[in-house]
């Protein structure tokens, strides 16, 4: 076995960015079949983070089709989401399938699958339950290269958030309330992405309302009293509104004109 770390760090120095680059590329090097090929890979390694990210994303895209799509979708969400997401929220968002009226939990990718498909670009937090990009420089790279990496991210995030709230679970309307709000809490446990979707769907559609795939969903949602009322109830509950404003009758009092505004 050749000594990878001394060769690489000897060439680049013990700088934080070099260490990050090293960690991203080490996996591909140690998977080479022979010491000679490992040395060849080492010689051709990019000497900066931009090159390291390009190499890593190329490896993600070379995965089998569904795994490559999963890896890129994870990066898209973590780069462009309006707030940090929990692993459960992200997995639930990734499981959403347009055109299906019910929620299918069997499509949720596991944390281990997400990490495997992202080749070290994302990390989970054991303390908070959040999943994030592994380094701020990854965020900077993804944001600066979004036209090539995620050309339709706004439509994808908007259609996922709005479409998710049109699932049968939410179209049946807001939950009844009681002292401890157990039914609302259960809904949020069973549908982890509901919180994010309820809070941010309107932000994501701001720039894409006229898009072909967004228009029909948006029009349907405006006239779906149950779905909109469910979203309103979730938002109000999580913001700590008084029970009178979380009551399903109050949430259902919104008219299509309210929903369109």
Predicted features, each with a name:
Residues 155-261:
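Hydrophobic repeat-domain scaffold segments
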